[in-house]
Amino acid sequence: MLRPVDRQDSRFLRDMLRHAYHWRLAQDPELPVYRYVKNWGRRGDAGVVAFEGPNAYGAAWYRLFPASEPGFGFVDEETPELTIAVVPSRRGHGSGAELLEALLVRARSDGFEQLSLSAEPGQTGFYEKHRFRELARKDGTVTMVASL
């Protein structure tokens, strides 16, 4: 099942960052990647959490960034940037697709024209299946956008 992300989910979103980036993050809240969840609940923040019973196992969310502090997949100040992660034991069963599609619907209903993301080269196939296309390559990553 899915439900909207709320302020109480900020710790879970931080945990999901570790899965999204496929490498261990130190517990340093000043690392650049934590900008995706720091002070969750500001204007432009939205997301969905996948859960079964009391256990959450995945999340997809987006956040707007200012040009002065861009995210890794920054396009412009009007395009929210997507982050998505599912715990390893639940991957390959459609949870990511369900989360992503729900978030695309939410972004469209919130009036956004597109979403962006940053992916590693060779890790773009999932996003391409969900309307994302490559926009640019920089710093060893691929910036992708999906029109809504």
Predicted regions and their residues:
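A short beta-loop-alpha structural element at the N-terminal edge
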Residues: M1-D15
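Hydrophobic adenine-recognition pocket in adenosine-nucleotide-binding enzymes
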Residues: V5, I84-V86
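Short hydrophobic/aromatic beta-strand or adjacent loop that forms the aromatic wall/cage
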Residues: D45-G47, A59, D139-T143
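Conserved acetyl-CoA-binding loop-helix of GNAT-fold acetyltransferases
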Residues: V86, G92-V105, S109, E128-K129
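Conserved active-site alpha-helix within GNAT-family acetyltransferase domains
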Residues: A97, S109, P121-T143
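Conserved GNAT acetyl-CoA-binding A-motif
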Residues: A107-A119
